[in-house]
UniProtKB/Swiss-Prot annotation:
It holds the Pfam family GlutR_N. PROSITE patterns: GLUTR. It is an enzyme of class 1 (oxidoreductase). InterPro entries: 4pyrrol_synth_GluRdtase, 4pyrrol_synth_GluRdtase_dimer, 4pyrrol_synth_GluRdtase_N, GluRdtase_CS, GluRdtase_dimer_dom_sf, GluRdtase_N_sf, NAD(P)-bd_dom_sf, Shikm_DH/Glu-tRNA_Rdtase. It comes from Rubrobacter xylanophilus (strain DSM 9941 / JCM 11954 / NBRC 16129 / PRD-1). It comes from the Bacteria. Catalyzes the NADPH-dependent reduction of glutamyl-tRNA(Glu) to glutamate 1-semialdehyde (GSA). This is Glutamyl-tRNA reductase. NADP(+) binds at residues 188-193.
């Protein structure tokens, strides 16, 4: 059995590669259903955000990499060769460590950002809803979420952290010198847009207009911050009015095209500043070649992030120290997973003997209900103490790669075939 992650992130590939393998929620569900039907991949979780697409699996053998990347390439309509070039592949302890680092935001573009923990939780929830998880990934993702929460609570890694929307607003401020009195157009009304509007308001933007495919959502977001809703159908006019345009719809097609930007610039004297934080991108890259238009995509934000990374180095180091023992603990559990049926067999066998012998003894005694319960408790305690050592030995041997079969355990560890002890209770005469 193999735990593995095949992934592509801002660390391994540029945005133009990442957007080709990004999944909308409905597409993610469809891909999980397809994986569920694949032989040799009993468990899978798909994590797709603006900065990463990662597939976590439990597979039967190392060749799973070829199969998984082939399925991913076919589903996304990309060349398998490009996936091999741009993806990373981690297995077993390194796959576990990677997920823990992702959940703790150590692998994020913005170290300490808060969104990733919720995104990991949502990805795991979707996989469970699609019946794609089992004992291994259930435990892995539960522990990953606990690690992420602990890191945030105990290291302060999220204190004064910069979310992607925060960085976008900061970059706009650096370009204009000040955002006081500026007009902003925000495309999209999701969580990223809400965070972005908040940061723009905090920096003094005078007018914010919000456009979304669903006008009602744009109106709700605008009402929260004293902005105004706009229609995407009026985009040419809205572009001409705005100083700053930030887009985060991730619709999968160009929301802002070159001719629209060129037309908007003809009716104004000042330049137009555009930030595209969507993956897939919303703004046609040809806009970069238009005089007076300044376009930044999500990869361009990395420079701003790096200037603010030093403040979080100490917290990140503390987080890494938490992750190491957590990886060891998970791998120790995993190494004993294959002997769980054996341990259950031993416990069940001992419990059958206990019940039989206690029942036989109680029939010969005249005890009150309280006294009978005391005998039951005593017998359970004796059995648990007798089994503790052998079960610990089984787990230790399994962890060392030396699992014992059922017969050998009975003979060498439990000695259940000793004088006067029967593995299966005899019938009463």
């Amino acid at each position: 059995m193999l735990i593995a992650v095949a992934g592509m992130s801002h660390r391994s590939a540029p945005v133009e590669a990442r957007e080709r393998v990004a999944f909308a929620p409905c597409a993610a569900r469809s891909f999980l259903r397809r994986l569920r039907e694949e032989d040799g991949v009993p468990e899978a979780v798909l994590l797709s955000t603006c900065n990463r697409t990662e597939l976590y699996v439990v597979a039967e053998a190392e060749p799973a990499r070829d199969r998984l990347l082939g399925l991913l390439a076919e589903d996304r309509g990309v060349e398998p060769g490009s996936l091999y070039r741009d993806t990373y592949w981690h297995t077993d302890a390194e796959a576990v460590r990677h997920l823990y680092r992702v959940s703790a935001s150590l692998d994020s573009m913005v170290v300490g950002e808060a969104q990733i923990l919720g995104q990991v939780r949502d990805a795991y929830r979707m996989a469970t809803e699609e019946r794609c998880t089992g004992p291994v990934l259930n435990r892995l993702f539960h522990t990953a979420l606990r690690v992420g929460k602990r890191v945030r609570a105990e290291t302060g890694i999220g204190d004064s952290s910069l979310s992607v929307p925060h960085v976008a607003a900061k970059l706009a401020g650096e370009v204009f010198g000040s955002l006081e009195g500026r007009r902003a157009l925000v495309l999209g009304a999701g969580e990223m847009s809400e965070l972005l509007v908040r940061h723009l308001r905090d920096r003094g933007v005078a007018e914010i207009r919000i456009a979304n495919r669903t006008r009602e959502r744009a109106e709700r977001l605008a009402a929260l911050f004293g902005g105004r809703a706009a229609d995407l159908g009026d985009l040419p006019r809205e572009l001409a009015r705005a100083d700053i345009v930030v887009s985060s719809t991730g619709s999968g097609e160009w929301v802002i095209r070159g001719p629209e930007v060129a037309a908007a610039l003809e009716s104004r004297e000042e330049p137009l500043f555009l930030i595209d934080i969507a993956v897939p991108r919303d703004v046609d890259p040809v806009v970069q070649s238009i005089e007076g238009a300044f376009l930044y995509d999500i990869d361009d934000l990395q420079a701003v992030v790096e200037r603010n990374a030093e403040d979080r180095q100490e917290a990140a180091a503390a987080a890494e120290e938490m992750i190491g023992p957590a990886v060891v603990e998970f791998m120790s559990w995993l190494s004993t997973l294959h002997v769980a049926p054996l341990i259950k067999e031993l416990r069940d066998g001992a419990e059958r003997i206990r019940r039989h012998e206690v029942s036989r003894a109680l029939r010969k005694m005249d005890l009150s209900p309280e006294q009978e319960e005391a005998v039951e408790r005593m017998s359970r305690s004796i059995v648990n103490k007798l089994l503790h050592g052998p079960i610990s030995e089984i787990k230790a041997r399994a962890g060392a790669g030396d699992p014992l079969d059922s017969a050998e355990v009975r003979r060498r560890l439990l000695s259940l075939r000793g004088p006067g002890v029967e593995l299966h209770p005899s019938r009463e005469p």
